[in-house]
Amino acid sequence: MEEFQGYLEKYRSRRQYFLYPLLFQEYIYTIAHGHGLNGSSKIEPVEFFGYDNKSSLVLVKRLITRMYQQNCLVYSINDSNQNRFIGRDLFFYSPLFFQMVSEGFAAIVEIPFSLQLGFSFKEKEIQKYHNLRSIHSIFPFLEDKFSHLNYVSEILIPHPIHTETLVQILQCWVQDVPSLHFLRFFLHKYDNWNSFIIPNKSSYAFSKENKKLFWFFYNSYVFEFEFLVVXLRKQSYYLQSTSFGXFLXRRNFYGKMEHLINVCRNYSQKTLRFFKDPFMHYIRYQGKAILASRDTHILMKKWKCYLVNFWQYYFHFWSYSYRIHINQLKNHSFLLGGYFSSVLINPLAVKNKMLDHSFLIDTVTKKFDTTIPVIPLIGSLSKAKFCTVLGHPNSKTIWADLSDSDIVGRFGRICRNLSHYYSGSSKKQSLYRIKYXXRLSCARTLARKHKRTIRALLQRLGTGFLEEFFTEEEQVLSLIFPKTTIPFPLYGLHRERIWNLDIIRIDDLVNHLDWP
């Protein structure tokens, strides 16, 4: 952040939004290539595929030189000279250029957010990440609230949004006209923008390319949607823009929407007066939102109709009603945050005796339950080439050139992360199949490297060389629960539910499950 202090002071004193000149500064791309504005980002640094750190500075200088040549932009706008332009400056239109500019622009566009929010946090001595909670904090909220609700509406937030709409949304925050014009040109000229803003399931989970700019635009769009439609008391702008890069591991977590009509009196009062419900709850994680209510099915259908019309008239694109599913909680389970969540109903008969008479009282208890989506998780493993679609382990061929310790370490981290994340499940037995596939995949990879059979490899190394990272989670759990609770060291641990509140980013394999 220190690199920007001189420019930011000038920025604040003049009250102008001159961000466009920063596109021609080398240190912008250096910061974008590293950890971002905050200097100590909590996510992995951005990786530029196709070149290493030593040659990155040379490519940045070449990029700035091309951008200084205004003829390149003139040629690119004229379609008749497109062949001449491509033959002359192929680098300017290469995927590498697209990636470098997108990361640099993502770093630049954070400046208005840092000015409006970063300095206020410093003046008020508010912790920077006070609103960034653990992913697992959403599930204790569901345990407390959802057992008393009746209907749930699953909303897949649509994202085939026009690029001009994104620019107009950003215009509320960035008032630098040249930067907005450059953004229009940048988004208009690249045919792969649709694949950039709409990540498919295969490329999203296992590719780090262009994520920072994608998350910035996506969260700006979602903020606009939530601010105008849901009108919650706590809104997304409390998360400063330096957190947009780390937002791939975050989720907006909101509580109860009470007396919605009082908040939105000046906005579509005739429409919103039908939606007053003190027991309506809204939760969003990435591209999926949950609306739950204790009211009737008619209210949920009104919300569904309202959302479809809102996307059509405000964001100017058609959203199909099948993207919103309304179900009863007692008969339905929904996928959120990598878990299948549902409300279990347990009938209970209580015998009550008064003098010479006895009565049987039938009661019903509701319990919020979370299970592991085994089949989708195996599908994620198969797409990552760890196993087949049926769950049979494969060797990870691209890891065969690594050392034995690196291979075992990578498989161990995958298993530990999955065990750590799914510690909140009430049925952990289903996770054993995932561990089995990862364990044999590790053994097959080592056998492929040493050109041996799995049996010969295990005989030489011993069967216990893979046990450490598979049993570490159980050993930790056995230390948490006293022996009075669990008579035997590891007996019944699969029934214990623990929400680890130190999880700040979701595993790629789990993250892959929630995208529509």
Swiss-Prot record:
Asked if tRNA processing is a keyword of the record, the answer is: yes
The UniProt entry's GO CC annotations, sorted and at most eight, read: chloroplast
Plastid as UniProt keyword: yes
Q: What is an example of a GO molecular function annotated in this UniProt entry?
A: RNA binding
The disulfide bonds in this chain are none
Any GO BP: RNA splicing
Please provide the record's keywords in A-Z order. Chloroplast, mRNA processing, Plastid, RNA-binding, tRNA processing
Q: Where in the cell is it found?
A: Plastid, Chloroplast
Residue span of the signal peptide, if any? Answer: none
Known function: Usually encoded in the trnK tRNA gene intron. Probably assists in splicing its own and other chloroplast group II introns.
HAMAP family registered for this protein in UniProt: MatK
The family assignment reads: Belongs to the intron maturase 2 family. MatK subfamily.
Its recorded name reads Maturase K
Gene name, Swiss-Prot/TrEMBL: matK
